[in-house]
Design a protein with these regions (language model features):
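Flexible, active-site-proximal loop/turn residues at the rims of small-molecule/cofactor binding pockets
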Residues: 25, 110
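A surface/extracellular/periplasmic glyco- and lipid-processing/surface-interacting theme
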Residues: 29, 49-105, 112-367
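Bacterial signal peptide processing site
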Residues: 20-22
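Sec-dependent signal peptide recognition
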Residues: 2-9
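Repetitive helical segments and hydrophobic/amphipathic motifs
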Residues: 11-13
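C-terminal motif of bacterial Sec signal peptides marking the signal peptidase cleavage site
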Residues: 15-18
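Post-signal peptide N-terminal segment of mature Sec-exported envelope proteins
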Residues: 27-49
Length: 367
């Protein structure tokens, strides 16, 4: 038997140098709490999988979502998702609709304010949205990440740095003009995606929902020529790392975002990771559902500062470290993204094979 301790989620504890920076960028520290675990030395090349779903009979008129591998309506098969910028400042809470997201990215929005973060939530079945947000501005990195899903990025403006990204051939975005809700907050915290013909009761103004926004735009609601296929590889059964000698216990994951205090805690009853920030569990304002994930992916990613706290992550890279975390255990991975709109692929650092993940929702953070 041997002891392994996860002292930090990144292998490099010193400094990371961002492309275009004249000074080194400080590496995030202790993004997963250190926890000794006893493991044996048995070499296992593949994760264990249980109860194969390969022979499962599909429910009528349904298919497995390419975002979660869950059964959803077959009419959605070719529908492209949206990627929505959601404000993650304390004043913006509680969020509406985030519990319905299929994939949630959390990345640093500014080098100022103790590394404050913003969500980018990816939603396949966007026609069912009643209220999602509140919505805020985008950064250059978001255009690269949204493009991986052939998603239309929904945001409210951004710094001039995004102009070149908006103009990319593969880029698709809806900026501003979303519904305003009367929530007693400052204007920047009142904008939400909603259903078609939503009318503000105070102002009597009616807003377009996404269906009408698509109809009025040059964008198709279905995948276009820039779609590169499914983003993830899903396992037929449940992925566990119980027999992996290199697996690390990961029951509490403290992300390096001091302002938000972003933390993921493993819930043994549900087998998922519950998201916490500002010291409290994240509950959806509409459904009171806990924001929780079957899969967690962390990427060691450098960034370049653009001035005034703005930044762009060096998301195009190869062979950098990261972790795939599920069922209370983590394994080391490497990741590769070959171009601006290319899919990020994740590989088992031990076997070199592309990882297979569990059915369900996924949290991704660039740290």
């Amino acid at each position: 038997m041997k002891k392994k301790v996860l002292a930090a989620i990144l292998l490099a504890v010193g400094v990371l140098t961002g492309c275009g920076n004249s000074e080194p960028i400080s590496s995030p520290i202790q993004t997963v709490e250190a926890e000794p675990i006893a493991t044996d030395t048995k070499e296992v090349e593949q994760p264990a999988a249980t109860e194969s779903s390969a022979d499962e009979v599909a429910p009528e008129h349904s298919y497995r979502s390419e975002l979660t591998n869950e059964w959803i309506d077959e009419d959605l098969k070719d529908q492209r998702p949206i990627a929505v910028m959601v404000d993650n400042e304390r004043t913006a809470l509680p969020h509406f609709g985030t519990a319905d997201a299929d994939v949630v990215y959390e990345i640093m929005n500014s080098t100022l304010n103790d590394r404050i973060t913003r969500f980018m939530v990816v939603v396949k079945d966007w026609e069912k949205i009643e209220q999602l947000g509140s919505i805020r501005s985008a950064r250059p990195t978001n255009f690269m990440l949204a493009a991986e899903w052939n998603a239309v990025l929904c945001h409210d403006g951004g710094p001039y740095f995004i102009n070149d990204w908006v103009a990319k051939d593969y880029s698709a975005n809806f900026s501003g003009g979303f519904a305003r809700f009367n929530n007693g907050k400052a204007t920047e915290f009142t904008e939400y995606i909603t259903y078609d013909t939503y009318t503000n009761s105070q102002k009597g103004k009616t807003y377009d929902g996404l269906k009408q926004r698509f109809a009025n735009s040059k964008y198709t609601t279905t995948y276009n020529d820039y779609y590169q296929g499914p983003h993830f590889k899903f396992a037929d059964g449940e992925v566990t790392f119980d027999d992996r000698s290199d697996a690390i216990s990961a029951t509490t994951i403290a992300l390096p975002f001091k302002h938000n205090g972003s933390t993921l805690k493993y819930n043994e009853e549900t087998g998922t990771y519950d998201y916490y920030e500002y010291g409290s569990a994240h509950k959806d304002a509409d459904s009171n559902a806990q924001l929780t994930f079957e899969n967690v992916i962390l990427q060691d990613t450098t960034f370049a500062e653009l001035g005034e706290g703005y930044l762009i992550y060096n998301a195009i890279d190869s062979g950098r470290s990261g972790y795939y975390i599920t069922q209370g255990k983590a394994i080391e991975v490497t990741w590769t993204k070959s171009s601006e709109n290319a899919i990020t692929h994740y590989y088992d650092a031990k076997t070199g094979e592309e990882i297979q993940i569990n059915t369900g929702k996924t949290y991704i953070s660039l740290i």
